[in-house]
Amino acid sequence: MINKIVKNVIENQFKGYNKLKDLPISLFVYWPYCSKICPYCNFNKYRDSDKVDHERMSKSLSRELESFVKNIYLNSNENSFIRERPITSIYFGGGTPSLAKISTFVETIETMKKLFPSSLSIEDIEITLEVNPDQKDLKNLLKDFKKYVGVNRVSLGVQSLVDKDLHFLGRTHNRIQAEESIKIARDLFDHVTFDLIYSRTIDQTLEQWRNELRYALNLADGNGHVSLYTLTFEQGTSFYRRLSSKGNKFKIIPPDDQKSSDLYDLTVCEAEAMGFQQYEISSFASSHNQKGKHNLNYWRSGDFIGIGPGASSRLTTLNNNNNNNNQISRYSFKNILHPKEWMEKLNSKEILCNAFIEDEFNPTIPLTNFEVAEEMLLNGLRTIEGVQLSTFTFQTNGLTFDQFLNMKQVEILQEQGFLILEPTCLKLTGNGRKLLDTIIPKILKY
């Protein structure tokens, strides 16, 4: 859908900038609280307790969404059509958003419908909720989120189906609870995804992972979605500190590069053999209909509004005036991290912010064409479809691949079997995707 709309805009040579109103927008709602802090997680998270002010959090989320749309999107005349653009996906992430009161997200949904009257009916919007397998009274909780919030897709944080590895990962559920949660979710929803982490330590063998993965995909019964991640050691996490631990008891030794590569190859092979096609480095779906619309919008460099402590946003506008020559402009927004400070800022005064001026609450960063291009490569090359030239040219105001890329390096990487440059797109091969982080710096001209 995005590429078709972008193509139409380009063919019209930017005439009638209101074609942008057809570009989808995703809404990300961040709930920062968790019952336990996982040792590998570097997200903005805080320990859940009875001191969490649910009512204030609820009002703050709605107020921020309202403020973003009214004071940022609608502050400039050229963007006054923004309310006509559809919200196509909503993602309740965290943290652990299922710990929030259902009334909180009901209020968020009602605010969204008021601000975006041209959005699809709530039944047609992909609405995802992240849930932990050991959530109390899971079945009834999911029923209520489905009935009152409109959730139609569930993402389960399974992470492993081996009890000792769940303990290592700091998870609070066990294998039986993980299996039961998948069954409960599948009985209630047509769209269910769950996460697994592999390449955990040097001790994990190919055969162990093969058996676990096959077992997991059998639980999915050939229908749905799975996200299969390698364990990463992010700075600031407990696991990162344990990499350099001097004591054998706490030190973690990750698999070497060759072992990690072999585990990745096995993952892709086994998943596809069981009917799950890879469409992004870590994402596998049993059909096109099961692909995650929300994340696809990220990877295709669509617009998204992030509300909640630490949430990020991206906004694309078309400056319909002589000074800017009807050029595309893209902006980055980043929220305050700490929930208390975030709520205080939101509730202490009217937030006066402008999409083109940095604000003390919600700093706005205008992205250059080259920054947009780099972000498009980092996101788009994660996918099997790659980066479409038409989208790239549209988002960067006319840049082509040869203007932005080191074409000599591109040619070398093509010959080595890591990269494919076609007249209409740039994409990585299977071997190339394993080396994404090292390939990107090589092919950038600047």
Swiss-Prot record:
[4Fe-4S] cluster binds at residues 34, 38, 41. S-adenosyl-L-methionine 2 binds at residues 95-96, 159, 171, 195. It holds the Pfam family HemN_C. One of its GO terms (cellular component) is mitochondrion. S-adenosyl-L-methionine 1 binds at residues 94, 130. The keyword Zinc does not apply. Belongs to the anaerobic coproporphyrinogen-III oxidase family. HemW subfamily. This is Radical S-adenosyl methionine domain-containing protein 1, mitochondrial. It comes from Dictyostelium discoideum.
